[in-house]
Amino acid sequence: MASLQRKGLQARILTSEEEEKLKRDQTLVSDFKQQKLEQEAQKNWDLFYKRNSTNFFKDRHWTTREFEELRSCREFEDQKLTMLEAGCGVGNCLFPLLEEDPNIFAYACDFSPRAIEYVKQNPLYDTERCKVFQCDLTKDDLLDHVPPESVDVVMLIFVLSAVHPDKMHLVLQNIYKVLKPGKSVLFRDYGLYDHAMLRFKASSKLGENFYVRQDGTRSYFFTDDFLAQLFMDTGYEEVVNEYVFRETVNKKEGLCVPRVFLQSKFLKPPKNPSPVVLGLDPKS
């Protein structure tokens, strides 16, 4: 297996067969079933972690390589960095970062209570280095666990796609409150026409670019325009917002799997300093 990666500002171009498949698969899941999926979202993710334990996702050692922000946001090399991983799963991103960088303190939360238990059972879990808690980012206030405007960087990695599109802005509003002015959200998630999107069977579609898996968990596939609008409507500024195209090639079987992700960086605007009025005595 080999992987070839490139970045771009335009969505992937479909083959004629892929276009035909998407045109055929237009039937939406019933409103009743959609409401049931929303009500049972936490239960379905908890069952996912019960089935897969900590074995489903690989540890993400690419994070610091892909997101230079984790290094560049420091003024000096051993400066302490406070981060929030919103949607940490079982710690596949969290623990490699803590292991690689001794000067990181991390807040980490997840929708699934079972995932949080797996994080706390990890041998690398250290309460001096991280605070981990269960949280539904669409309704639980992060300020109950994280001081306001105390976080240097927020990691939002393959998380927002699992949230209903109507509630995504609530997640962004929530993390906005704990992020320092002038600091960033680092985002990576599924992009439009990713291989996973094209593999969904008929009757899996919930809405535009939104699908349900057989286990009841859901996935949204982002366009750069949709994501940019979502962040900017919540008060962030766009810094980087680009597609990552990755082809996984299996020469032995003659397969080429096109993966598409969106990798982005959005900034919470810095606070404007108080205007200085010339010619006035500040004591008067």
UniProtKB/Swiss-Prot annotation:
A Pfam family this chain is assigned to: Methyltransf_12
Q: Which top EC class applies here?
A: transferase
Kindly report the protein's main subcellular placement as a broad class.
cytoplasm
The protein in question is named tRNA N(3)-cytidine methyltransferase METTL6
Q: What's its EC?
A: 2.1.1.-
State how it assembles. Monomer. Interacts with SARS1/SerRS; interaction is mediated via tRNA(Ser) and is required for N(3)-methylcytidine methylation.
One GO MF term: tRNA (cytidine-3-)-methyltransferase activity
* Result for mutant: residue 111 to L: Decreased affinity for S-adenosyl-L-methionine
Q: Which GO terms describe its cellular component?
A: cytoplasm; nucleus
InterPro entries associated with the record: Methyltransf_12, METTL2/6/8-like, SAM-dependent_MTases_sf
- Catalysed conversion reaction: cytidine(32) in tRNA(Ser) + S-adenosyl-L-methionine = N(3)-methylcytidine(32) in tRNA(Ser) + S-adenosyl-L-homocysteine + H(+)
Subcellular location(s) of the protein: Cytoplasm; Nucleus
Encoding gene (name):
METTL6
